[in-house]
Regions:
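A short acidic/basic microdomain associated with nuclease active sites
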Residues: 1-11
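Hydrophobic residues on conserved beta-strands that form the core of alpha/beta folds
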Residues: 3-5, 27, 72
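Active-site donor-binding loop signature of nucleotide-sugar glycosyltransferases
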Residues: 8, 30-32, 93
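Structural motif
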Residues: 12, 23-25, 69, 88
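Short secondary-structure boundary/hinge segments and terminal tails
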Residues: 12-14, 78
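Conserved catalytic cores of phosphodiester-cleaving nucleases, focusing on short active-site segments
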Residues: 15-37, 52
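Mg2+/Mn2+-dependent nuclease catalytic core
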Residues: 33-62
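Domain-level recognition of nuclease-like catalytic cores that cleave nucleotide substrates
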Residues: 62-102
Length: 102
């Protein structure tokens, strides 16, 4: 995997990392928590993933990239109170939940 952009804004949404992994264009959300009881992975909420998906579609539309190449990943980093990583998890190819009916 090769990072090609960092902190990309698409409308009001910021994508932490955009990377290429073979034919996939990977949009990565990075979540970090320091010395807290909750885990960084627990903060990957469906609404955030839905916004990331919409941002990825917008990113690809502007660059005429087929949406079939999109992959959504997340990296969750848990730090101890000194800032040392105690857990790093990489979630590949997350399924994006359907938004609730209005």
């Amino acid at each position: 995997m090769r990072v090609i952009e960092r902190n990309v804004r698409v409308g009001r949404i910021e994508i932490d990392l955009v990377a290429e992994d073979g034919e996939d264009l990977v949009f990565v959300e990075v979540r970090t928590r320091r010395g807290q009881d909750d885990l960084a992975a627990e903060t990957l909420l469906p609404a955030k993933l839905q916004r990331m998906w919409r941002a990825a579609i917008g990113y690809c539309d502007r660059r005429e990239i087929p949406p079939e190449r999109i992959r959504i990943d997340a990296v969750a980093i848990d730090l101890d109170s000194n800032g040392t990583a105690r857990r790093i998890e990489h979630f590949r190819g997350l399924e994006i939940p359907e938004p609730p009916p209005e």
